[in-house]
């Protein structure tokens, strides 16, 4: 979800469209040599590539979260990272109908062949937990 600290949104009207989002400071993920583009999906309008000129670029999601919490701009964050801050009203969801594309969680292991039962159970548990988290947080998307 796209999120911002309330202080960021107190200085001007909350954006109602992607065009209005250009009036706000944004936080990018990656490096300065890359173009900053958010891939956002809207149920009725489909997918768009929102190109922006970030005021800050960091190279990991924890850095993005910290920058947003400290009021440095608007950024997309995985709901599993932002939901506690949203519940406490420390972050506000911006343009909730526009959702960033889903991320992927990777688990690295040598091979499925000969996979230890404990590792198989761990992978099954993680899949179950992420699926449940998705269901629990559906209202924030």
Identify the role of each PLM range.
Residues 28, 49-60:
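Short beta-strand-to-loop elements that line the ligand-binding cleft
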């Amino acid at each position: 979800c796209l999120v911002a600290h309330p202080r960021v949104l107190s200085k001007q009207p909350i954006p109602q469209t992607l065009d209005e989002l250009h009036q706000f400071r944004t936080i990018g993920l990656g490096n300065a040599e890359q173009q900053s583009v958010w891939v956002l999906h809207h149920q009725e309008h489909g997918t768009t590539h929102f190109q922006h000129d970030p005021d800050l670029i960091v190279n990991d999601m924890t850095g993005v979260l910290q920058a947003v919490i400290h009021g440095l701009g608007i950024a997309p964050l995985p709901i599993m990272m932002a939901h506690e801050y949203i519940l406490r009203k420390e972050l506000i969801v911006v343009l909730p109908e526009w959702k960033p594309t889903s991320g992927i969680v990777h688990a690295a292991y040598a091979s499925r062949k000969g996979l230890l039962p404990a590792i198989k159970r761990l992978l099954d548990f993680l899949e179950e937990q992420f699926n449940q988290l998705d269901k629990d947080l559906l209202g924030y998307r």
